[in-house]
């Protein structure tokens, strides 16, 4: 029985190890309605000179920074409209003109069979997704990436999680909730927390 459980756990982790995209959400004090995002992704489209990371509608993005993960080198980027992104030919033609993207300048075009691993740092402010309600922290956000981690601010404890997640504690005492989105659509995440006494 114990061997079966271990085998099942190993099988369940295989997609997570094989998956490439990963997003870390570090919730800042809820009064700020802000959370720091670290997004790891690999550009694999042959010949691509850029990588376009959409800025979610309703969120205000600040403190952007991009590095190449293999070297740690800072990469040039700019925020562009959907119209400007479409003009490059590297985003879908049906992208709305008013959409916003972080346009990352890759070190060189992605070679055939190659890749460029990048890490995007940004801070979102979004009072709809992240707020303080009746003294409780509420984070509600659909997550489309396969692997996601949400870290609560220090001094808060989890009291509700609407989607299956693995709860653990960081070395600094912050609570983290890890999600594996095995769906073909977005995982509806809702986290509620309260201040520790």
Q: Predicted regions: what is each one?
A:
Residues 38-42, 53, 119-123, 151, ...:
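Residue-level recognition of well-ordered beta-strand positions that form the cores
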Residues 19-53:
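Early extracytoplasmic/domain-onset interaction patches
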Residues 63-66, 70-137, 171-197:
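A surface-exposed beta-strand-loop module
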Residues 39, 108, 148:
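Hydrophobic/aromatic beta-strand elements that line small-molecule binding cavities or substrate pockets
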